[in-house]
Amino acid sequence: TAQLWVRDDAVKSIADLKGKQIATTTGTTAHVFLDRALRSARLDPTKDVQIVNQRMAEAVTSFVSGAVPAVALWVPFDVTVKQKVANARKIVDASAFFPEAAIMGGWAARNDFYDANKPALASLIAAWTEVNDAMLANFDAAAETLQKTQYKQVPLADFKESMKFSKYYTSAEWRKLYQDGTATKWLQQVTDFFAVAGNIASPVPASKYFDPQLFLQTVKA
């Protein structure tokens, strides 16, 4: 759901951001996306641009006010930009870097809790897959319910458009991605980013902190 927006007509491409400030929230999906986008244009995120770290609402406010010429955000903050900055332009979004910059949402548990509560966690997985598949089977209705109950401040049309920027899979598709190692690979990509960005010397590999087996045991082929 991450996007890169600019307001300067002189900025035609990512490469044109060299030497400029870009507001975002570091350590988030928007930051991972921005790093990938800059490197795709042969820009060093640590040397060729100045990344301004702010909470996303503040980053968007800085962009709207003209304090910074670019912002890397996630939806639905793009709605604010489109409403308040007439000349704002989106020059790239995360879909351009999928699956190289794929970021998964999920849940984490302490090892002791995980070991002692596998039946409860299996029930959580089963409930999630049921809701996930029902949502995908009735996407428009699900979007309307979410907007009505959780995102009233976002117009329904904008909310539905925002939902299109995420990638969704059925439980059967997720099972394949878990089984063939794709999900672990996507997690490792994010680990690699934070190892560099956070100067982590010996990060725990995804294969050690991610266990796909409970999902595979719960969601049958």
State where each predicted segment sits.
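Conserved C-terminal helix/tail region of periplasmic/extracytoplasmic solute-binding proteins
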Residues: 187-221
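Pocket-lining segment of extracytoplasmic ligand-binding domains
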Residues: 57-152
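Amphipathic, soluble alpha/beta structural segments
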Residues: 1, 155-161, 213-221
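Residue-level signal for nonpolar/aromatic packing positions in well-ordered secondary structure
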Residues: 4, 17, 34, 63, ...
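Secondary-structure end/capping motifs
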Residues: 115-199
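Short, glycine-/small- and polar/acidic-enriched structural segments
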Residues: 1-55, 59-62, 69-75, 90-91, ...
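Short coil/loop linkers at secondary-structure junctions
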Residues: 39, 44-46, 152-154, 200-201
